[in-house]
Amino acid sequence: MKFLIAFAVLALVACINANPYGSNRGYEGGRVAYVQEVGYGGGSYGNQGYGNHGYGNRGYAQPLYSRSSNPSASAAAAAASAGIRPGRYEQAAVIGYDLDASYNGHSRGGYGRGGY
């Protein structure tokens, strides 16, 4: 019974330590970092001058990578089966990005994503 309680406490500590949302210990405190790589093959017109999007296609998707900032926290999360697995995630998985990147017309001198 002692081992069961000890394992449950260790699993709870590992979940709290590796939680990417509830930690207030800064970036290096066991958080999972999402890194967005720069895309390529952007718009066909005004790629640099008008909001970095242009009028043409938006280019290829920009992949997201999940990378842990603390190896011991990711090992603890894997042991507790509560962590996000390191790997490659596509841009469509982040809902807020697609909502924010919508076209809103001529706003503050730029096209594509507006000034606000």
Swiss-Prot record:
A single GO cellular-component term on record: egg chorion
GO process terms (BP): chorion-containing eggshell formation
Subcellular location(s) of the protein: Secreted
UniProt KW Signal keyword: yes
Predominant location: secreted
Highest taxon, organism lineage: Eukaryota
Position of the signal peptide: 1-18
UniProt entry keywords in alphabetical sequence: Secreted, Signal
InterPro entries: Chorion_2
Similarity comment text for this entry: Belongs to the chorion protein S15/S18 family.
Function, as annotated: Chorion membrane (egg shell) protein; plays a role in protecting the egg from the environment.
Protein name as annotated: Chorion protein S15
Organism of this sequence: Drosophila virilis (Fruit fly)
Name of the coding gene: Cp15
